[in-house]
Regions:
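Long, charge-patterned amphipathic alpha-helical coiled-coil/hairpin "stalk" segments used as oligomerization
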Residues: 86-131
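A short, acidic, flexible beta-alpha connecting loop/helix-capping segment that sits on the rim
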Residues: 147-151
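Positively charged, polar, low-complexity stretches
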Residues: 4, 9, 13-17, 21, ...
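Short, conserved catalytic or adaptor-binding loops enriched in Gly and charged residues
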Residues: 1, 49-52, 133-136
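Short, structured patches in soluble enzyme cores that scaffold and shape functional sites
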Residues: 108, 144-146
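Short, basic, glycine/proline-bearing loop/turn elements
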Residues: 2-8, 115-118
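Conserved small/polar residues in nucleotide/adenosyl-binding loops
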Residues: 153-155
Length: 155
């Protein structure tokens, strides 16, 4: 989808850095959060949507609905869309389903479970690292950058 101006992995999904730094940086007017669990949680979805400042629309979709929406090219004509998910596994699946993503920004991924630190504020488990390698094999430019004012770390 040509309208995706930022595809980002961030396990906090939406927070102040996204709204105050990334949205203005890429001039986004729409955010699509792709998360099956959050999409089913009506309360959490509502809270996330209500965080949107004027002029920004936030959607919370499970992966099936996100795939449908992102494939509907006319549905976001003229929009500048940020797509956010908690894991690179989600983006690997979106690409398998035919969604075109050229670049993937890996932002905050905290240490938990089997995750090990791989960069500042970024930790991955073996499956997530494998997904990153698969994305790179599919010619997706994957990089670490927590905020736009910091330099990119290319993978």
């Amino acid at each position: 989808m040509k309208n995706i101006v930022l595809a980002r992995v961030d396990d906090r999904l939406i927070h102040t850095e996204i709204l105050t730094l990334w949205v203005p940086e890429v001039r986004a007017n729409r955010i699509i959060i792709v998360d099956d669990v959050v999409a089913k949680d009506k309360f959490r979805s509502k809270v996330i949507k209500e965080m949107a400042p004027q002029g920004l629309i936030i959607h919370v979709y499970g992966i099936d609905r996100a795939t449908e929406k992102l494939k509907e090219a006319p549905s976001f004509d003229g929009e500048r869309v940020i797509v956010i998910a908690e894991s690179p596994l989600v983006f690997e699946e979106l690409i398998k389903r035919g969604i075109k993503i050229n670049q993937l920004n890996i932002g905050g991924m905290g240490i938990r479970g089997e995750r090990k630190a791989v960069a500042r504020r970024v930790a991955c488990d073996a499956m997530e690292m494998e997904a990153i390698h698969e994305l790179i094999k599919k010619h997706v430019h994957v990089y670490f950058q927590t905020v736009p004012t910091l330099s990119l770390i290319h993978i």
